[in-house]
């Protein structure tokens, strides 16, 4: 079993059109990877977690790469690809 080296966390909430847009970009980027199994994607809702709600309520969607904020509001596909490539290089070194 391959353990994903890079963790993506998409924080949003239901009914958020920017969250839907972000999910679509992330899904497209992951589908285009040579090794999509090397990246895991977890989606969290601020409605289910008071801590996330307090921290991110006015910034969703928020995309984390390995626990660090990568972007808020809009996900840029090219920037995400570069971040994933960097995360992979960092894991390999």
Which residue ranges define each predicted feature?
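Alpha-helix termini
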Residues: 30-36, 88-91
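Thiol-based oxidoreductase modules, predominantly thioredoxin-like and allied folds used
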Residues: 36-50
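Local sequence-structure signature of Cys/Sec-based thiol-disulfide redox active-site neighborhoods
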Residues: 2-32
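A short, hydrophobic beta-strand/beta-hairpin element that forms part of a small beta-sheet core
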Residues: 61-69
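A structural signal for the main folded, soluble domain(s) of proteins
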Residues: 18, 27, 69-75
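Short, charged, intrinsically disordered terminal tails
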Residues: 5, 82, 86-93
């Amino acid at each position: 079993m391959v353990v994903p080296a890079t963790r993506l966390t998409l924080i949003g909430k239901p009914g958020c059109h920017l969250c839907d847009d972000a999910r679509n970009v992330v899904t497209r980027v992951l589908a285009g990877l040579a090794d999509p199994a090397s990246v895991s994607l977890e989606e969290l809702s601020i409605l289910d977690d008071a801590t996330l709600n307090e921290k991110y309520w006015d910034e969703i969607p928020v995309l984390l790469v390995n626990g660090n904020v990568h972007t808020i509001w809009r996900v840029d596909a090219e920037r995400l690809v570069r971040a994933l490539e960097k995360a992979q290089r960092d894991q390999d070194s």
